[in-house]
């Protein structure tokens, strides 16, 4: 794209996590091009990696509109990355890189904004229910933490309502939930959903079940299984407690997702994002996830109508940042 002075105008998007930063160029149709992934640890500052990308792609003299999705609060000029030593001023970053515009959004705002663009190949439906056009959408994502966001459509534009829903109080539903809650409460003053629906949360469920079942782990390493190891052994059927832990994780995720649906009237669907659940889609399909999602007493008939999906698109952050930027600069 060119402006009136024949300067190339580009839209730059980024998805910045604690380990990697992904940068790309997008167009008005939200196509993502020139995707590059860099290790955050290889650069002393965010400006260095963005400058490197622009130089590498011959874009230093372009008019750049940038939208950066970042895993930390973005409502002040001064930004401190949660899991990185990077600190910067939004105003100074824009000036240093000579950007035409700079917009920072939360990482889950980006994921939420990607949802209306997803095709059937970029998501997997769990259970029944049909999405209603332009109705509210909810998304949650177990990963390092538990991200939550909501989308509403106003005058044919999607707007994201962020929040910290993952930190709401955990509410046990069945007897095993209660036992896990009681066991974890011996060391915690308060238990949020994030402390169960995350990588760390799955590990906590497993460790609680080892004690509840009065079983000694076969060795010290077995008692410190990672979330990935727990899910892998559960799927393989080689560890009964791992299976029990993953099954309970799926149930609790169903309860939490169902709560989101009722709270926000998410008749456009509830979407599951994050790096954990896509590892065991078939396991989730065969679990009690959907039963827990629908079982809401007198309101069960509402959740029975609401579809649930797992996002399988590999770059939802970049796609959502592109959608956000194109809505700002149509």
From Swiss-Prot:
Any GO BP: glycolytic process
SUPFAM superfamilies: Actin-like ATPase domain (SSF53067)
UniProt-listed Enzyme Commission number(s): 2.7.1.2
Pfam family, one: Glucokinase
Compartment list: Cytoplasm
Binding site for ATP: 14-19
Top enzyme category: transferase
Superkingdom of this protein's organism: Bacteria
GO CC aspect terms: cytosol
InterPro entries cross-referenced by the UniProt entry: ATPase_NBD, Bacterial_glucokinase, Glucokinase
Keywords: ATP-binding, Cytoplasm, Glycolysis, Kinase, Nucleotide-binding, Transferase
Catalytic activity: D-glucose + ATP = D-glucose 6-phosphate + ADP + H(+)
Keyword Protease: no
One Gene Ontology molecular-function label: ATP binding
Family, per entry: Belongs to the bacterial glucokinase family.
PANTHER family: GLUCOKINASE
Protein name: Glucokinase
Gene (UniProt): glk
